[in-house]
Amino acid sequence: MALKEYKPTSPARRHMTVADFAEITKAKPEKRLTKPVRKSGGRNAHGKVTTRHIGGGHKRRYRVIDWRRDKDGVPAKVAAIEYDPNRTARIALLHYLDGEKRYILAPVGVAVGDTLVSGADVDIRPGNALPVRTIPLGTVIHNVETAPGSGAKMIRTAGSFGQLMAKEGGYAQIRLPSGEVRKVLQDCKATIGQLGNVESSSVRVGKAGKSRWLGIRPTVRGLAMNPVDHPHGGGEGKSGQGNPHPVSPWGQKTKGLKTRNNRRTDKFIVTRRRPGVRNTQR
């Protein structure tokens, strides 16, 4: 993937960059592998906003991705590389030898015509899926399960990769893109290689309208609101927030507080993540 730049014909065009989509080989998705997506506008079943800054956006169909890679020993040929509006990574359409078709996330180095396979004793090459116990130490991986057979949960965004660091006592230690080192059972599956569309994080949106196409609404500062709308609102001119600590629109303290509540899985974290560190370039 490469980034396309424009001549500065307008203030938005001056700094806008887009993907060139050179790797895309098929425009329309496989209809049987798609589902409708119903927009929520960030609202729950009662109609209340539970997630701010969501609304609008282009109509999409969800592409059903094979997260489990459970067709062990059945070779599949890469039929196409496609765009997926629901994620940053590209997806690959696989045609299995038995006639079944499935989507997977497309790693770097996988092209149309390649043959991929999953199983315990397959080759270590990009796109193949194996149990972690059969993967050599130091191998670059993505699409990692957190429990055997649960489907991939970690390392799924464009350009990301993890690295197998150690194996001990039925568990394997994997360094995640955030710098966190996490333990998973050695029977969990992972896919070899780094995910494609590596320069996705370098794309510059350029204008507000493009964010609206993506379904992202504006983020308004609490300081710019009225007192009825936010605890930071009101005052004459550019006055301060008026609180000893910044708070959310609902009065909860924000900024600098821990947001992780899932203590149940703390025992699987060997090394905490390092803020500002991300493995997306090799």
Curated annotation (Swiss-Prot):
Nucleus is among the record's keywords: no
Pfam families: Ribosomal_L2, Ribosomal_L2_C
SUPFAM superfamilies assigned to the protein according to its UniProt record, in alphabetical order: Nucleic acid-binding proteins, Translation proteins SH3-like domain
Any Gene Ontology biological process: cytoplasmic translation
Record-linked Gene3D superfamilies: 2.30.30.30, Nucleic acid-binding proteins, Ribosomal protein L2, domain 3
Amino acid composition bias (Basic residues), ranges on this chain: 34-55, 270-282
Keywords assigned by UniProt, alphabetized: Ribonucleoprotein, Ribosomal protein, RNA-binding, rRNA-binding
GO cellular component: large ribosomal subunit
Region Disordered: start-end pairs: 31-55, 223-282
InterPro entries: NA-bd_OB-fold, Rib_uL2_dom2, Ribosomal_uL2, Ribosomal_uL2_bac/org-type, Ribosomal_uL2_C, Ribosomal_uL2_dom3, Ribosomal_uL2_RNA-bd_dom, Translation_prot_SH3-like_sf
GO molecular function, one term: rRNA binding
Coiled-coil region(s): none
Domain of life the protein comes from: Bacteria
HAMAP family the UniProt entry points to: Ribosomal_uL2_B (MF_01320_B)
Family statement: Belongs to the universal ribosomal protein uL2 family.
Functional description taken from the UniProt entry: One of the primary rRNA binding proteins. Required for association of the 30S and 50S subunits to form the 70S ribosome, for tRNA binding and peptide bond formation. It has been suggested to have peptidyltransferase activity; this is somewhat controversial. Makes several contacts with the 16S rRNA in the 70S ribosome.
Subunit structure, interactors included: Part of the 50S ribosomal subunit. Forms a bridge to the 30S subunit in the 70S ribosome.
Name of the featured protein: Large ribosomal subunit protein uL2
Organism: Anaeromyxobacter dehalogenans (strain 2CP-C)
